[in-house]
């Protein structure tokens, strides 16, 4: 049986019933795969050297897990760390050269007063014996995972030249119950699945979460009014605003890069078309006008155009139209089903759900060298909803395994996949948030 169009099914709320699952638990993380060509790095355990109570967060373990799941690094297993220096002056570089390590990270955790901790760490090039980073960060106990992610970001950027995206958040939807007793929740968590936070609970479907560029708000679709409606919700305060509840479909909201506009799919004129709403005035501009179904808009990074899914050519493909309207150009030509586009920060890569027969996988079109080249990122048969990390190093997507929904984060070179799954639940509709700013 052919899979129904994911993007049309979502807009019309034709959701498959789920088994009874709990939605209050955090996500369980499993890292799948690895690569022999990943850069070897040792993150030495960082002991607590204070006089009080040690933080519950194992800083070095979080940093190691971040680097491992990026696909760019291969950390040395703890059992093979034969020496445990905490300062650069204690590092015996020949030991780590013998272990064929390219880099080593050492550090320690100390008291900073008033219940806070200070983490000092250093990154070294093993071959050269050269210190590349020497930094200190201070945080309270409940922010030690944030500090660990920021450390991993700094290490990642120093070695690769690309800004790290570990200290970011993801949004997703969980579901529980069955039939008429379904319950949904819109959740936000750290990029590795920790620290889940419930944003919205509903007895009706929740779909298509989309982050504002400052990471402070989420746009999403709710059916609580009986019909699809689009809301904006402030994550910190919980305040929300109904911005679209026209007759028919109100779906697939997407914030513009400047946060002032919202692209959306509306059928207010009878057929699903792409519109742009000015969030200040609430004025609508219709961008497409075609007998085909146009949906799933997503902005180009420069804000000058919008990608969207359309079946105007007979089958779902990705098209692009100027943000001011006009004629649309087809973007994808490989395969007879390409939908749900996510565009990298530089506009050079487009991730899609690509279908062939009854198999749907995440594929990526790379235009870095001019002519498009394609790669398959996921091995599943029912994979959908790709979402790039803000640095495009990883792609988050939804999959189904054993009749339940799970999430995967895959490195952009497909070397490593990280599975995020509710211990007793179903999860879907992922969206990777923007970079965070330290306050």
UniProtKB/Swiss-Prot annotation:
This is Tol-Pal system protein TolB. Part of the Tol-Pal system, which plays a role in outer membrane invagination during cell division and is important for maintaining outer membrane integrity. One of its GO terms (cellular component) is periplasmic space. Keywords: Cell cycle, Cell division, Periplasm, Signal. It is found in: Periplasm. InterPro entries: 6-blade_b-propeller_TolB-like (IPR011042), PD40 (IPR011659), Tol-Pal_TolB (IPR014167), TolB_N (IPR007195). The gene is tolB. Its main location: periplasm. It comes from Xanthomonas campestris pv. campestris (strain ATCC 33913 / DSM 3586 / NCPPB 528 / LMG 568 / P 25). Belongs to the TolB family. HAMAP family: TolB. Disulfide bonds: none annotated.
């Amino acid at each position: 049986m052919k899979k129904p169009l994911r993007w049309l099914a979502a807009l019309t709320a034709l959701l498959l019933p789920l088994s009874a699952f709990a939605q209050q638990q955090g996500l369980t993380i499993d890292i799948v795969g690895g690569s022999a060509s990943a850069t070897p790095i040792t993150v030495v355990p960082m002991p607590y050297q204070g006089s009080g109570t040690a933080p519950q967060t194992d800083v070095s373990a979080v940093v190691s897990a971040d680097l491992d799941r990026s696909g760019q690094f291969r950390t040395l297993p703890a059992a093979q760390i034969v020496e445990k220096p905490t300062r650069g002056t204690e590092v015996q570089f020949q030991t780590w050269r013998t272990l064929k390590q390219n880099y080593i990270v050492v550090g320690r955790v100390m008291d900073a007063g008033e219940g806070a901790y200070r983490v000092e760490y250093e990154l070294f090039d093993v071959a050269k014996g050269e210190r590349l980073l020497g930094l200190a960060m201070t945080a309270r106990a409940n922010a030690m995972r944030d500090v660990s992610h920021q450390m991993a970001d700094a290490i990642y950027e120093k070695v690769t030249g690309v800004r790290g995206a570990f200290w970011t958040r993801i949004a997703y939807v969980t579901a529980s119950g069955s039939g008429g007793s379904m319950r949904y929740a819109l959740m936000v968590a750290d990029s590795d699945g920790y620290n889940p936070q419930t944003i919205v609970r509903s007895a009706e479907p929740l779909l298509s979460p989309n982050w504002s560029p400052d990471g402070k708000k989420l746009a999403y679709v709710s059916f609580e009014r009986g019909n699809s409606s689009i809301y904006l919700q402030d994550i910190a305060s919980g305040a929300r605003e109904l911005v679209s509840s026209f007759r028919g479909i109100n779906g697939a909201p997407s914030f513009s890069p400047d946060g002032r506009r919202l692209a959306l799919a509306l059928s207010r004129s009878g057929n699903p078309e792409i519109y742009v709403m000015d969030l200040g005035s609430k004025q609508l501009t219709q961008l497409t006008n075609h007998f085909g179904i146009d949906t799933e808009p997503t902005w180009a990074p420069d804000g000058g155009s919008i990608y969207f899914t359309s079946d105007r050519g007979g089958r779902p493909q990705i098209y692009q139209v100027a943000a001011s309207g006009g004629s649309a150009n087809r973007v994808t030509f490989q395969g007879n089903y390409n939908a749900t586009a996510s565009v990298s920060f530089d506009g050079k890569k487009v991730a899609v759900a690509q279908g062939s027969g009854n198999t749907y996988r995440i594929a990526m079109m790379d235009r870095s060298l001019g002519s498009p080249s394609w790669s398959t990122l996921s091995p599943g048969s029912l994979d959908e909803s790709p979402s790039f990390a803000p640095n495009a190093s990883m792609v988050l997507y939804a999959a189904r395994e054993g009749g339940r929904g799970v999430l995967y984060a895959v490195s952009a070179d497909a070397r490593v996949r990280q599975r995020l799954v509710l211990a007793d639940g179903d999860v879907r509709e992922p969206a990777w948030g923007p970079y965070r700013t330290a306050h």
